Amino acid sequence: MIPATYTLSQITARLGGEWRGEDISVTAVRPLADAQAEHISFLANPKYKAEVHDSSAGAVIVSAKAADGFEGRNLIVADDPYLYFAKVARLFSPVVKARGGIHPTAVVEPGATVPTSCEIGANVYIGANTVLGEGCRILANAVVQHDCKLGDEVVLHPNAVVYYGCTLGRRVEIHSGAVIGADGFGLAFADDSWFKIPQTGAVTLGDDVEIGSNTNIDRGAMSDTTVGNGTKIDNQVQIGHNCKIGSHTVIAAKTGISGSVTIGSYCIIGGGVGTVGHIEIADKTTIGGGTSVTHSITESGKHLAGIFPMSTHKEWARNAVYIHRLSEMNKRLKTLEQQLSDAGQDSK
């Protein structure tokens, strides 16, 4: 494939912003430290300005405030350099469109609807009565069980699995090894053993949802587990049954969301977070990595952190500096207690 090439003026014509210097051609986006003359890079944080001076990048994306320090450099000036970088990167890595056709080793059960615009890879399985939208890409060894509904331009990467009865919105992307709609962990204890509760709900994903590799989203016990439009979930995340996750929320890797948790929209949940079940997390909540969420968060916009117990980020940061000194402080406390005890004995 011939690499895409854009001039700075072509980039700004498509994406906005202002180019300064020579109207050079660039072929890729690279970090400042690695970029060469044919590359474009970016400065998102002004504290790294020195790296721009040391960089061999042909052009750099900067904010208007930072641009004044780089006279003589080829620049694109943008309101948000990081977002602009992401959009430029997309120019060089466009979304792959489906090549219509069904591989001869794929199995499409009777009653399934697969438009001719869809790309169905080797060893794919499409269950009975499942309906695919236009332009879907179901790649090698992926499985879509019966009675599912997929919107237009859904992508299932190799070995992704969608269980029966699930609904995926438009432009959903499921990465390899992810499982959508496996049974939730519902059990009742009786007669010295566990009785499995049938999980009769399903999973519904909104438009533009992305699910990372080896992530599991369990089907609901009676109603659907749901994920709102634009939400992005990282690799190796566990979403329990009956969870309701809002729109445009992001959840980082190794997080576990227990069953029947409701998470609002525009939340940011760091890596390795764990929650108890049956709680609510308000819109625009930020939860730091490794936090144990033990109760509902009812106030929108909170920034929370802490291994245990959960507290505000400010409280956690203030207390965290003492963690590595707890043993020393405990010894000093015992010494002071002993001194006070001895002083009390002497005064008698």
From Swiss-Prot:
GO cellular component, one term: membrane
InterPro entries tied to this protein: Hexapep, Hexapep_transf_CS, LpxD, Trimer_LpxA-like_sf, UDP_GlcNAc_AcTrfase_non-rep
GO biological process: lipid A biosynthetic process
Enzymatic class: transferase
Pfam families with a match to the protein in the record: Hexapep, LpxD
One MF term in the entry's GO annotations: N-acyltransferase activity
Catalytic activity: a UDP-3-O-[(3R)-3-hydroxyacyl]-alpha-D-glucosamine + a (3R)-hydroxyacyl-[ACP] = a UDP-2-N,3-O-bis[(3R)-3-hydroxyacyl]-alpha-D-glucosamine + holo-[ACP] + H(+)
Known pathway: Bacterial outer membrane biogenesis; LPS lipid A biosynthesis
EC number: 2.3.1.191
Residues at the active site: H241 (proton acceptor)
Spans traversing the lipid bilayer: none
Keyword Transferase: yes
Highest taxon above the source species: Bacteria
Keyword set includes Repeat: yes
UniProt keyword annotations, A-Z: Acyltransferase, Lipid A biosynthesis, Lipid biosynthesis, Lipid metabolism, Repeat, Transferase
Subunit architecture: Homotrimer.
Similarity comment text for this entry: Belongs to the transferase hexapeptide repeat family. LpxD subfamily.
Its job: Catalyzes the N-acylation of UDP-3-O-acylglucosamine using 3-hydroxyacyl-ACP as the acyl donor. Is involved in the biosynthesis of lipid A, a phosphorylated glycolipid that anchors the lipopolysaccharide to the outer membrane of the cell.
Protein name stated in the entry: UDP-3-O-acylglucosamine N-acyltransferase
Gene, per the UniProt record: lpxD
